[in-house]
C-alpha cells in the first residue's frame, strides 16, 4: 500500500445535508471531503460537531449507513476500494463524529482521535 490519500475536494453542506438527511440546525460545525475523482477512488473524510450528544449518535448512524452503502457499491467494481471502505471506523467522541476512508484510514483516524480528545479537554 502506498499510504497516499487521493486528492480530496470539500463538499458544500447544502450539497450533501439533504442527501444524507442531516438536519443543518443540529450541526454546529462540519467538514466533508470526497475524492476529486469519485469514480476511481472512494476516499473521503468527515468531521462533524453536533449540537448535542443525542444528535451526534444520529450522525453516527447516518455515516455508518453511508459507509455500508458505499461498500456495497464498491463491491461490484473494485475489491481494493471495497476493502478500504469496509475497514473504515466511524468514531464518536462527545458531540464529535468523524471518519476517514483511505488506505491510511487507521492512522489518520488515530490522529483525529487524539486531536478531538484534545479539543474536548480544552472545553
Description of each model-found segment:
Residues 12, 16, 55, 59-63, ...:
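Stable alpha-helical elements in mature extracytoplasmic
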Residues 37, 49, 80-121:
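A short, solvent-exposed beta-edge/loop patch
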Amino acid at each position: 500500500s502506498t499510504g497516499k490519500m487521493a486528492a480530496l475536494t470539500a463538499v458544500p453542506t447544502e450539497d450533501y445535508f439533504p442527501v444524507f438527511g442531516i438536519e443543518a440546525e443540529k450541526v454546529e460545525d462540519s467538514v466533508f471531503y470526497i475524492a476529486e475523482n469519485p469514480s476511481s477512488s472512494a476516499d473521503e473524510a468527515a468531521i462533524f460537531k453536533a449540537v448535542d450528544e443525542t444528535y451526534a449518535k444520529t450522525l453516527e448512524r447516518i455515516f455508518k449507513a453511508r459507509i455500508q452503502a458505499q461498500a456495497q457499491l464498491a463491491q461490484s467494481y473494485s475489491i481494493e476500494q471495497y476493502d478500504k471502505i469496509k475497514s473504515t471506523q466511524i468514531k464518536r467522541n462527545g458531540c464529535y463524529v468523524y471518519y476517514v476512508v483511505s488506505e491510511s484510514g487507521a492512522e489518520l483516524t488515530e490522529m483525529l482521535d487524539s486531536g478531538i480528545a484534545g479539543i474536548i479537554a480544552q472545553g
